[in-house]
């Protein structure tokens, strides 16, 4: 038991024998914490080939991420959009920055996708910003979701997600607590 004084060994042993006693002491292991919070293990983090891609939605067939209104400016957000040929605001360059992380660069603007905020709220909006590979908010990794699809997770531990699961064009694409949903 970490941070406990053993001035009365019998009390400590009584607490350690029952789950309710452990809860009173605040003792838990990672498995117990995950079970209590209802967390599940996600797929394996994988390396992906660098290149230019569209970031397609599994939830909404024929749709993917694009920069809102095809803007070039820093601060422009990401939205869901019907995929169209030759729309550079729907294409993103995936660039390895080491340690399994990548920058995701909007082809039309050359700016990096960045989760806005510290991620502590469980969600963050995504904007394009000047590229700075040192920023945690611009670091992304890919988690195998099976069937050739991936969850894209920020270094802030939130995953790219369609806001409220609404699949209409123009709906916000943001990061949200990784929940293994489409």
PLM segments and residue spans:
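Active-site-adjacent mobile loop/cap segments within catalytic or ligand-binding domains
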Residues: 1-44
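Lectin-like carbohydrate-binding module/patch detector with strong preference for beta-trefoil
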Residues: 45-182
């Amino acid at each position: 038991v970490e941070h406990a004084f053993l001035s009365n060994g019998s009390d400590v042993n009584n607490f350690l024998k029952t789950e309710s006693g452990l809860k009173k002491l605040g003792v838990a292991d990672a498995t117990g914490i995950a079970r209590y919070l209802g967390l599940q293990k996600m797929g394996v983090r994988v390396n992906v080939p660098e290149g230019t891609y569209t970031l397609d939605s599994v939830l909404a067939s024929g749709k993917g991420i694009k920069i809102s209104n095809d803007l070039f400016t820093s601060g422009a957000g990401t939205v869901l959009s019907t995929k169209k040929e030759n729309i550079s605001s729907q294409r993103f360059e995936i660039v390895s920055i080491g340690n399994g992380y990548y920058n995701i660069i909007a082809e039309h603007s050359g700016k990096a996708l960045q989760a806005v905020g510290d991620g502590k709220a469980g969600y963050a909006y995504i904007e394009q910003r000047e590229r700075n590979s040192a920023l945690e908010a611009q670091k992304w990794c890919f988690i195998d979701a099976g069937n050739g699809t991936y969850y894209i997770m920020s270094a802030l531990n939130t995953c790219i997600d369609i806001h409220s699961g609404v699949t209409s064009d123009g709906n916000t694409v943001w990061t949200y607590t990784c929940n293994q949903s489409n």
